[in-house]
């Protein structure tokens, strides 16, 4: 199964407790890692971060905004996130798309 996790406002692989990184980031990171044991998982964020691929887990940063930006100020980037997401990935190739 191909699974897409959308983590628009913060990278779930950044340091916990930094800016918006907290419980939801831990949840997305852990569930993505566990799901990748048996499935292909792609996690995408708008926050600037380093992208990586580790076996069945791929993390993609669309590098739209800095991590120190307040969550309320990130809303203006939603359309750009959507556009870059559609340009970067074939969304029809995913069986499940989950956004938190």
Regions found by a protein language model. Give the residues of each.
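A generic structural signal for alpha->beta connector loops
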Residues: 38-40, 56, 93
